[in-house]
Amino acid sequence: MTYTVEVLVDDDLAVDAALVERAAQAVLTAEQVPAGCEVCIRITTDAELHRLNRDFRGVDAPTDVLSFADDGNSSQFVTAPNLPRYLGDIAISYDRVLVQAAEYGHSPARELAYLTVHGMLHLLGYDHERGPADEALMRAREEAVMTALGLPR
């Protein structure tokens, strides 16, 4: 299937944007999302994730990944029925990628792919914070996609 994944990388960050796109595409394919959907993923810094977390979630601390799903219910904009469905935006802290990769004992590439997969699943409605059953389901989907990418635990 064909999807549009836009990856924006802040200046001075040495990021494998192709890996981010591949991980996002793998989630969309695994979840059988209809072709033509679009998503934007920004790779940025702890400072920017801290600001976004504070401004949008009221949490005054940095975090590793944030997902902003487009619920399609905005009355401010008119959308044509033939336009691709916009799933939303994801922001990932590359600073957290490096720290967490070292903490968990795996490569920054695996951590970057994992946070991309995690954020994509949130865009699609998965939420590990709803309870143990939802957490188990989301973790299983994450592991399935990571295995398909050749990056299992």
UniProtKB/Swiss-Prot annotation:
Keywords: Cytoplasm, Endonuclease, Hydrolase, Metal-binding, Nuclease, Ribosome biogenesis, rRNA processing, Zinc. Its cofactor is Zn(2+). One of its GO terms (cellular component) is cytoplasm. Pfam families: YbeY. SUPFAM superfamilies: Metalloproteases ('zincins'), catalytic domain. Binds 1 zinc ion. It is found in: Cytoplasm. InterPro entries: MetalPrtase_cat_dom_sf_prd, YbeY, YbeY_CS. Zn(2+) binds at residues 118, 122, 128. Its EC number is 3.1.-.-. One of its GO terms (biological process) is rRNA processing. GO terms for molecular function: metalloendopeptidase activity; RNA endonuclease activity; zinc ion binding. Coiled coil: none annotated. HAMAP family: Endoribonucl_YbeY (MF_00009). PANTHER family: ENDORIBONUCLEASE YBEY, CHLOROPLASTIC (PTHR46986:SF1). Single strand-specific metallo-endoribonuclease involved in late-stage 70S ribosome quality control and in maturation of the 3' terminus of the 16S rRNA. Belongs to the endoribonuclease YbeY family. This is Endoribonuclease YbeY. It comes from Chloroflexus aggregans (strain MD-66 / DSM 9485). The gene is ybeY.
